[in-house]
UniProtKB/Swiss-Prot annotation:
The gene is aspS. It is found in: Cytoplasm. One of its GO terms (molecular function) is aspartate-tRNA(Asn) ligase activity. Belongs to the class-II aminoacyl-tRNA synthetase family. Type 1 subfamily. Keywords: Aminoacyl-tRNA synthetase, ATP-binding, Cytoplasm, Ligase, Nucleotide-binding, Protein biosynthesis. It comes from Sulfurovum sp. (strain NBC37-1). Residues 197-200 are annotated as: Aspartate. One of its GO terms (biological process) is aspartyl-tRNA aminoacylation. It catalyses: tRNA(Asx) + L-aspartate + ATP = L-aspartyl-tRNA(Asx) + AMP + diphosphate. Homodimer. The lineage of its organism: Bacteria, Pseudomonadati, Campylobacterota, Epsilonproteobacteria, Campylobacterales. L-aspartate binds at residues 173, 219, 446, 483. One of its GO terms (cellular component) is cytoplasm. The record marks 30, 82 as: Important for tRNA non-discrimination. Its EC number is 6.1.1.23. This is Aspartate--tRNA(Asp/Asn) ligase.
Length: 584
């Protein structure tokens, strides 16, 4: 049907007859000569329909409109002097059309394909049209390249690609499961996997040693810009390994994929403990493209003549007082901006935001009256203040302070426009707490199959796990852990999580049984493929890197899913639908 893709036609083909096919990107009539920009998968090629050359082709070209599907045959010639287009691979040549066929016509487009301001709901409803754009094609070409590079890298490292079940048992791992009713077993349900976690551990028990999968995962959770109800992860597991072995494989894989996709990245990543990340940056996924690190000043504030601050400082295990130095901040920010910063952190639960300004004649600000000269000097020294700097203080319960000061750090960086573009800063965050306590309930910070460093403890929140996350530019790219491979340890962890023996057997009995049959030490990691491509392309939403994504309400506007099903289907599944209560 065609002899060449548009992008392949160049000066070497001048004088040759070629056939190309694609969609009309634009049509222009210049004094009876019709110019058509024909676009196929990744390039535009100019067609010239001149009645002096071929009257039949010109007559057909008069009918052509945007997005018509054409097949064109003709001779390649050089463009006239001054008419070349350096932005196109085909910009030095054009086709004089001898034969033109309209393979299909198109209705007028519901939106301008390259208009970035078009309502997103319209674009998602007609997603197949948006996929015709060069931007979309380049995105999925990069995604394909990353996927191929992943398989090649892991194959070279001796990993075996194995597919695990999509219909499985409901074992909630933090988010809600998507449930699938069984027709054969009425009243019973499968669940779509939130991850292949348990199956990949069972593969290690089965002796597969090194496994990987580019896996579809499903989580019924509230959506954000970097979340979708169904997503893809690069899933990896290996036996007879320690944390260093896993990290070595992960760094090799990640760097190989980025380099194969044309990016310059390091092959070894920096590391930081979870505790250091929270204390310095207020986040377990800090963006290391810029500095703005916090320091602890709770001991200095304990001596201040302010009952609120000194009271907070008297409980250093529970509370924090953090200082965040902004170089030249006193010169950059107005008093109005300073007040605006306080309003910003209040949105996240802060009672306020203190600040000092480093002037030529010393430290100034509304809080200086509460400190002795020695303590003011201690603040200057601790924070490394220089003339022109500003320093901001957050005080209160530690998790609250970490949260709002961490958000404030990002807000400052965005306000000052100091975040470099086209830079990739990877970071391993290590030594995560095994558990966290919320409302008196113990939860696993990662998942309950993570190996704890020890189960000897006075405070359950002090137990550390052998877990690690890889962070890229402030986004959690993925993470993993060494797994529990002994039944008694797994049972003890379930017990600490408040999971009874009966519940453990009901939900995880198959895993506990497998651990009785010589399970090897094992560990692994998973990387979010969608997030990786989102960062590579600079996309603002994960929806831009998924071919047919869902909305913020987990709907597919293209197919109108989810949708009602007929009563006969429900009857076969032994399901009766109860009308949902109206939402406020």
């Amino acid at each position: 049907m065609r002899t060449h893709y548009c992008a392949d036609v160049n000066e070497q083909h001048i004088g040759e007859t070629v056939t190309v096919a694609g969609w009309v990107a634009s049509r222009r009539d210049h004094g009876g000569v019709i110019f058509i920009d024909l676009r196929d998968k990744d390039e535009v090629f100019q067609l010239v329909c001149d009645p002096a050359d071929n009257a039949d082709a010109h007559k057909i070209a008069e009918e052509v409109r945007d997005q018509f599907v054409l097949i064109a045959t003709g001779k390649v010639r050089a463009r006239g002097e001054g008419l070349e287009n350096p932005n196109l691979k085909t910009g030095k040549v054009e086709m004089v059309v001898d034969s033109l066929t309209i393979e299909n016509r198109s209705k007028p487009m519901p939106f301008e394909l390259n208009d970035e301001k078009v309502n997103e709901e319209i674009k998602l409803k007609y997603r197949y049209l948006e996929l015709r754009t060069q931007k979309a094609y380049d995105t999925f070409k990069l995604r394909s390249k990353a996927t191929i590079a992943t398989r090649n890298a892991l194959d070279e490292l001796g990993f075996l690609e194995v597919e695990t079940p999509i219909l499985t048992k409901s074992t909630p791992e933090g988010a809600r499961d998507y449930l699938v009713p069984s027709r054969v077993h009425g009243g019973e349900f499968y669940a779509l996997p939130q991850s292949p976690q348990l199956f990949k551990q069972l593969l290690m028990v089965g002796g597969f040693d090194r496994y990987f999968q580019i896996a579809k995962c499903f989580r019924d959770e509230d959506l954000r810009a970097d979340r979708q109800p169904e997503f893809t992860q690069i899933d990896v597991e290996m036996s007879f390994c320690d944390q260093e072995d896993v990290i070595t494989v992960a760094e090799k894989l990640i760097s190989d994929v980025f380099i194969k996709c044309g990016f310059d990245v390091p092959t070894k990543f920096n590391r930081m403990t979870h505790s250091e990340a929270m204390e310095k940056y207020g986040s377990d996924k800090p963006d290391m493209r810029y500095d703005l690190a916090m320091v602890d000043v709770i001991d200095i504030f304990e001596r201040c003549d302010n009952e609120i601050f000194s009271g907070i400082a008297k409980m250093p295990k529970k509370n924090r007082i953090k200082a965040l130095r902004v170089p030249k901040g006193d010169e950059i920010f107005s008093k109005r901006q300073m007040k605006g910063f306080e309003d910003y952190v209040r949105k996240f639960g802060a009672q306020g935001l203190g600040y000092f300004q480093m002037k030529e004649d010393g430290l100034k600000g509304p809080l200086t009256k509460f400190f002795t000269e020695d303590d003011i000097q201690a603040i200057i020294d601790r924070c490394g203040l220089e003339v022109g700097d500003a320093v901001f203080f957050g005080a209160g319960e530690k998790k609250l302070v970490w949260d709002y000061m961490g958000r404030f750090r990002i807000y400052l960086a965005e306000t000052m426009d100091i975040i470099p573009e086209d830079t990739f800063e990877f970071l391993w965050v290590m030594d995560f707490p095994m558990f966290e306590v919320e409302d008196g309930k113990v939860k696993a910070l990662h998942h309950p199959f993570t190996q704890p460093k020890s189960l000897d403890f006075n405070d359950i929140e002090e137990i550390e796990s052998i877990a690690y996350d890889v962070v890229l530019n402030g986004t959690e790219l993925g993470g993993g852990s060494i797994r529990i491979h002994k039944e008694d340890v797994q049972e003890e962890v379930f017990k600490l999580l408040g999971i009874s023996e009966e519940e453990a057997q009901s939900k995880f009995g198959f895993l506990l049984d497998a651990l009785k049959f010589g399970a090897p030490p094992h560990g692994g990691f998973a990387l979010g493929l969608d997030r990786m491509i989102m960062i590579m392309t600079g996309a603002s939403s994960i929806r831009d890197v998924i071919a047919f994504p869902k909305t913020q309400k987990a709907q597919c506007l293209l197919t109108q899913a989810p949708s009602e099903v007929d009563n006969e289907q429900l009857k076969e599944l032994s399901i009766r639908v109860r009308q949902a209560a109206p939402t406020a």
